[in-house]
Amino acid sequence: MSHHVPNLYGTPIRDPHERKRNSASMGEVNQSVSSRNCERGSEKGTKQRKKASRACDQCRRKRIKCRFDKHTGVCQGCLEVGEKCQFIRVPLKRGPAKKRASVVSIEKFSSDNDPLQYRPRTHSYPMNSGNNYLPSLARNSSFPSISSLFVPSITAQSQQFVKVPYDDIKRRSSLATLGSDSSISTEFGGNYRLDENLNVRQEGKDIVAKGMITPVEEMGACSSNVRRQGSQSLPIQEQRASPYINPFISGRSRLSSLSYTSEATTSEGNTQGKNQCMLTPNSVRSIEKERLNSLTAGCPNKKLGTDGRSDKWDKNSTWKPVYRSSNPSHPSTEKNVSLNQEASAKPLMLGTYRQFDATSFYKVLGIYYNFFHINFPVIPINKSKFTDMLDPEKPNVIDEIRQINNEIIQCFKTALEVLVFCKIKQRRSSKSTKSWSRDSLCDFQKGLYYIQNFNKCIADCFQSLITIKPVLKQNSSVIPSRIKFIYFSTIIVLNFILILAGEESSLLLGPSVGVFNEFQAHKLFLPFENTSPMLLLNSNEESGDEILDYAVLFKRLYILLNILDTLQSFRLGQPKLINLNFGSAIETYFSDKTGHNQVVEKAPVALDNILRNLKLGEFITYFVLNRKSLQVNVPHHLLFTNQTDYGEFAVEKGEHDNIAGKFETLLKKKEILIRKLLNIEQKNDHILENCCNSDAEMKNIGELVCSMITLVSGILDSITNMNAENSVDLDSKPLPNAYFAQDSEEELMSPTQSITSNLASEENTRCTTKDLMGTVSIFMLPMVEECYNIISLIGPIPTTLISLYIRNGNMAKGINDRIMTLSTALNELVQITALFNTLEPFRKNAHDRAKRYYVSATSSTGCYESVMKSMYSGKCAASNASNVAPSEEENKKILKKFADIGWKLMDDSELGCCCCFFN
C-alpha cells in the first residue's frame, strides 16, 4: 500500500510511480510541455501558481522584492522586521472561469488518497487555547523556524496523524504537569486527539497522557498506519491582531487568566485529563519532517525500546526527547507523598542534556547577571556560586531526589528564559541581533513565542512549582538546601517578571507569599538558637557553614519578596502582604560582611549599586507602612502635627548622584511639602487668618517646589541616558565571545566585572550612569509614574507665584531672586515634558494616574475633590476668614489652592501612584 504523507509545507507527496501516473489529475505545475498536455479522461489539469512566483502579503504591501527561502519558510523582509510571512491574499481572477469539473475530480482524488487534506502553507506560531506546556531551553536547543510552526487543521472526527511507538516504555508519574482537557484545541480550529485504535499498552499511554515530546527520526517510521476519516477541514481562524506586542510595554490587567491552582484543583485536573499528547511547535515540525524522511528512505516500521532510546538520541544532537508525564490516579493532596514512588522513573533531564544545552543556558544566565542582577539581585548569590548549585552531580545527592532536582531546575530555566527573551531589544538591523543569533538562528522566533504566550508561560511555570510543593515539603529533610533555594528563587523570578511588566494584579504575589509562609521562612528572622528543625534547612547536612550559608540565602529571598510586595503596594495603594519589620536587613544580609562565599556580587562597583537599590526598596517599605490612610480614626490634630520619623532616612543636605538616592530624596521632600501645604489650611485648630506671614509661607513652598522639579529632571535624565526603554540592549553592553563558545562551561567574566576590575583600585567605587548603560531596573516604572504625578500636581505652582509677585509690584532684591529661581523651574518643566515623551514604554502604559476623584464631586469646570480630603472632611472644616485684610485676600486664596494641591499629593502617597478611583 502506498504511503501518502504531506511534507513540511503541506504539499502531498505520493509514491513515485503513482505520482507519475496521476501528475495531471493532481494539478501539479510542471515545467515540461509533455506534463502540461497530460489529461485525465476529458479533464485538463489545472495550473496552480507557486508561492515562490509571487510576493507575500507584507512585501506586496511595502512594494519590495520578496526573497522567499523555502528552507526557513520566511522571506528575508518578514524575517528582518519580525512579521508573519503570509500568502492570505487571493489573487484576482484573470481570463475565463476555470472548469469546475477538473477541480471536483482533483478534490475527489485527494480525499481518497491523501491522509491529510491539502492546506496552503501558513507561517505563524500555534497559539494553543488549551493547557499545554511551554518549551524550555533545556528541551529545545534550536528553536523552530517560522515555517516549522504550521499546524495543519484536522477535523474533529479525525484521529491523530501519527502513531507514537511507546510500547516498551514504562514510566511513572512526573511532578511538573497539570491536568488538561482530552483534546488540544489550537487557534487554527483543529483538535488533536489520540487514536483510539492504537495498539499501545497502558504503560506507554501514561507517558503520552500529559507529556511534551520532541520526536526524532524513528518516530517517522510509524506513519504508514495513519488514516484519514473526515472529508472536510475546518477553516483557519483569524490570527491575533497584534501577536508581537511586547508584554512589558502594556501592563493593564494582563494576567486576568492567571489564577492560583490549589493542590485539590491540581488533583482534580489530573484525574480528568487522560491520554493526552501535548503538541508543541518543535513536535509538529519534527513529526512532519521525520515522517517524510522515513517515507522517502523506505524505513521499516519498528518499535523503539527503552534501552536503545538514549543511544539514538545521542546520534542526533539537534532533536532530543524530553518526557514529562503525570499519573492521573496519584492525587497531589495526599498527605504522605512517597519520594521513591515519584522518582521510580529517573529521567536524566539535566544530566543527559547538560552538554546539549549548556551554551544556550549559560548565555541566558550571563545576560541576567549583566543586565538585571546589577540593579536587583533576583538570584541573591554571585554567578560562580549559583552555577555550582545547578550541577546535578553534586555530592550527597541520591538517585531518588534526582527527578525533583531536574524538575525544579527546569522550571527555573523556563522562568529565566521568559524574563530574558521578553525583555531583549530586537532591531531590524543591529549587531545585537546578529550576536544573539550566533548560537541559534531561531532565538528571535523563540522570543516571539514567549511574547505571544506570555501569560500562559508564567501560569504553567508557577503551576509546575505548585505541583512540586507537596513532594518538596514532605521530603524536606532529605532534599538538599540548594534545591530548595533554586525552587524559591524561581518564585521570585516569576514575581519579578510580572512587576517589571507593570502588572496591576497580585494573583501570583499572594500565593507566593503563602508558599514562603508555609515553609516558615519568617521564622528564620526570629532569635532561635537551633534553626536545623526548620523546613528550609536540613538537619542531616554535615557542614555547619553550609547551614549558615543557606540560612542567609533564604533570608535574602524573603527580603526580596518583601520588596516586590512593597512595590506593588506603592503603585496600587493596596495593603502589604508582608508586614514583618526586618530592621536594617540590607546592610546585615546583603553586604560583603556576610562572607566571601555567599556575597551577592564580587565586583565592588556592582555591589555598591545593588545595595543602593535595595536600600531604596527598604525606604519605600517604611514609606508604605506609615501611610496615614490606614489611620482614618486618628484625631485630626495628630494627623498634621505628627511628622513621620524617618530616623536614618533623614533628608541630607547634599543630593545623591545616583537615581536611587535622588528618588529617595524626592519622596522625603514630597512628604515635607504635603505637611507644609496642609498646615496652611489648618494649623493649631485655627484657620488662615492666623497665618501672620503668608509671604514667608510662599517663599518656603516655592523653594521646596523648585528643588523637587530639579530632582525630577535629574531622575528622568538619568533614566533616559541609562535605558529609556528599560530593555536588554546588547548594543550598549555586548556580551563577550566566550558566551558563544561551544565547548566551554567554565566561569565567564561579565562586562561589569571586567570594567570594575580596573576601578576597584580607585577611591570612588560607586556605580555611575556609564556602568548602568543598557541595564534593566524594576524601580524605573514606579519612579516614572511617581514623577509624572508629582509634576502634574506641582507644575502650576511656579507660574502662580511669579504672577503673584509681579502683580504685587514689589521688585525688591529678594523677590527678583525668587522670580529667577521659579523661571528656571519653568524651563526644567519644559525639559521634563520632552523626557516623558522619550520614555516610550512608560508613555504607552500611562493613563490618568493623577486624577483620583469621585464622579459626584467633579464640578463643571473639570476640578475634582481629593479622596483623602473627602475622608477627613469632618475634621478639616474651615471657618469664615472674616478678619482677613483686603491686601492679603489674594494671597490667602492662592494659599488655599496650594492646600488643595497638598491633599492631592497626599492622595498620590496614600492611594498609589497608578490607580484611578471612581464612586
UniProtKB/Swiss-Prot annotation:
Its main location: nucleus. Residues 56-85 bind DNA. It comes from the Eukaryota. Residues 23-36, 318-338 have a biased composition (Polar residues). GO terms for cellular component: nucleus. The keyword Transcription applies. SUPFAM superfamilies: Zn2/Cys6 DNA-binding domain (SSF57701). SMART domains: GAL4. Residues 37-46, 304-317 have a biased composition (Basic and acidic residues). Keywords: DNA-binding, Metal-binding, Nucleus, Transcription, Transcription regulation, Zinc. It is found in: Nucleus. InterPro entries: Carb_Metab_Trans_Reg (IPR050797), Zn2-C6_fun-type_DNA-bd_sf (IPR036864), Zn2Cys6_DnaBD (IPR001138). Pfam families: Zn_clus. This is Transcriptional regulatory protein EDS1. It comes from Saccharomyces cerevisiae (strain YJM789) (Baker's yeast). The lineage of its organism: Eukaryota, Fungi, Dikarya, Ascomycota, Saccharomycotina.
